C-alpha cells in the first residue's frame, strides 16, 4: 500500500520479520497476530505540493492540478525537485536534507514547476519502495491511499515511475482512518474474522505503468538520485 498524504508511506505486510535498517526502512510487529509490517517513509509528500501552492504559486492545489492536466508539459525539460522540506528518512535518514529546485530557466512555466513537484515526490517514493524491496519483500498489488491520491494525473505518474499497477479504491483518500477503525472493530470483537471486517473496498480506477513514459522518466530518476548525492555534504 502506498499512502500519499502529508508524508508518504510505502507499507507492506509480511508473515515473518524482514529488515533493511541501513536504508531507514521501518520494521514492526503488526497489530494482527503473526504478522509484521514494513514501511518506507518520506517526510514531505503531498505537503510539498501544499507548500508550493501556498508559498510559490499562491494558487489552490486543485487549480494547479487542473492547469497541469491541460498544459502538456514537456517533462524532459522540467526542473528537478528534491522534496526534502523536512529532511528525509527512507532511504537517506538525513534530518539536514533540504528541498531543491534544479534546472530553472526563463522558459520554466508554472505548470512545469507543478509537474516537477509531483515528479520529485514520486521519485522519492520510488527510492523508498526500492529500499523496502531490498529487504526481500516484493508486494504484488499496490493500493494507493491518501489525499494526494485524489489526483488521477499523480496516480498515473506514480504508476509510471514505480513501473507497477496502482489501484485506487473507494474512500481511498481516507484510507488510514478507515484502517484504524477496522482494527478497533477487530479488537473489540475477538470472534470476528479479517474477511468479515476488512473487505477490499470497491475499485475506482487502476493505473497501468507505461513503458514509453518510463523510458523518458528513467534518465531523470537517475539524475534525481545523483543530485542528492552531490548535494548531501552541502546541506
Set out the residue ranges of the language-model regions.
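Active-site core segments that coordinate phosphate-bearing ligands/cofactors
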Residues: 1-145, 150-235
Amino acid at each position: 500500500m502506498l499512502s500519499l498524504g502529508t508524508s508518504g508511506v510505502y507499507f507492506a505486510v509480511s508473515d515473518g520479520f524482514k529488515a533493511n535498517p541501513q536504508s531507514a526502512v521501518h520494521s514492526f510487529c503488526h497489530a494482527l497476530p503473526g504478522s509484521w509490517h514494513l514501511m518506507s517513509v518520506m517526510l514531505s509528500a503531498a505537503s510539498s505540493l501544499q507548500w508550493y501552492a501556498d508559498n510559490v504559486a499562491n494558487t489552490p492545489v486543485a487549480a494547479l492540478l487542473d492547469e497541469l492536466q491541460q498544459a502538456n508539459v514537456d517533462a524532459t525539460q522540467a526542473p528537478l525537485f528534491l522534496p526534502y522540506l523536512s529532511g528525509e528518512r527512507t532511504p537517506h535518514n538525513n534530518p539536514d536534507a533540504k528541498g531543491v529546485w534544479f534546472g530553472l530557466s526563463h522558459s520554466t512555466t508554472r505548470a512545469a514547476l507543478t509537474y516537477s513537484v509531483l515528479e520529485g515526490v514520486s521519485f522519492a517514493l520510488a527510492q523508498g519502495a526500492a529500499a523496502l524491496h531490498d529487504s526481500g519483500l516484493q508486494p504484488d498489488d499496490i493500493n494507493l491511499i491518501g489525499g494526494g491520491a485524489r489526483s488521477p494525473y499523480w496516480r498515473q505518474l506514480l504508476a509510471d515511475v514505480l513501473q507497477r499497477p496502482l489501484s485506487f479504491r473507494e474512500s481511498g483518500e481516507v484510507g488510514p482512518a478507515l484502517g484504524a477503525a477496522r482494527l478497533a472493530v477487530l479488537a473489540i470483537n475477538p470472534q470476528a474474522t479479517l474477511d468479515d471486517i476488512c473487505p477490499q473496498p470497491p475499485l475506482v480506477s487502476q493505473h497501468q505503468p507505461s513503458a514509453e513514459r518510463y523510458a523518458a522518466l528513467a534518465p531523470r530518476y537517475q539524475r534525481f538520485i545523483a543530485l542528492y548525492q552531490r548535494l548531501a555534504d552541502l546541506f
